[in-house]
From Swiss-Prot:
Subcellular location: Nucleus
UniProt name for this protein: Transcription factor 21
Job description of the protein: Involved in epithelial-mesenchymal interactions in kidney and lung morphogenesis that include epithelial differentiation and branching morphogenesis.
Biased composition (Polar residues): 31-44
InterPro entries from the UniProt entry: bHLH_dom (IPR011598), E-box_TF_Regulators (IPR050283), HLH_DNA-bd_sf (IPR036638)
Domain of life: Eukaryota
Length: 176
């Protein structure tokens, strides 16, 4: 931040001296000329912000000089990432469709969102846990006869079901 003090002028001169020196790890030796030193000599009459803007532009141009090669590399990476994402989404969609077909009380022609599918699967799992916990078999079937579609076990709302499940955890699992 410029305050107009003498120290600002000193900082400006120090930055000019440092601009002429090679940066650590830049891979350039001090004997080679670069565009930034040429730009700084052209900026003697210009303001500090104009000079730094020109230096930034020339540095960006140097970095992107092999523009075609860099763009091709980026495009290849982008295409590979897109292919991975498409494959991931195919696997996820297939898993959801298998989950929908395993839910016994959902009509096959019913369209369900992913959230609805997960909620129904959760209530079905809760029903199966309840059966295992109570050792109840209704008419000899282990099937969710009392389940109402969607999201209810034996007429209980989902929040009451969560409370019931938290009190009767199986296999030593902990509440999340």
């Amino acid at each position: 931040m410029s305050t107009g003090s003498i120290s600002d002028v000193d900082e400006f001169h120090e930055s000019e001296l440092l601009d002429g020196l090679p940066k650590f790890g830049s891979g350039k030796d001090p004997g080679t000329s670069n565009e930034s030193t040429e730009d700084s000599s052209n900026c003697e009459g210009a303001s500090v912000s104009e000079c730094t803007g020109k230096r930034r532009k020339s540095a960006n141009m140097r970095r992107s000089a092999p523009n075609g090669v860099a763009q091709e590399g980026k495009q290849v990476q982008r295409n590979a990432a897109n292919a991975r994402e498409r494959a991931r989404m195919r696997v996820l969609s297939k898993a959801f469709s298998r989950l929908k077909t395993t839910l016994p009380w959902v009509p096959p022609d019913t369209k369900l969102s992913k959230l609805d599918t997960l909620r129904l699967a959760s209530s079905y799992i809760a029903h199966l846990r309840q059966i295992l916990a109570n050792d109840k078999y209704e008419n000899g079937y282990i099937h969710p006869v009392n389940l109402t579609w969607p999201f209810m076990v034996a007429g209980k709302p989902e929040n009451e079901l969560k409370e019931m499940l938290n009190s009767t955890r199986l296999c030593g699992t902990t509440a999340s």
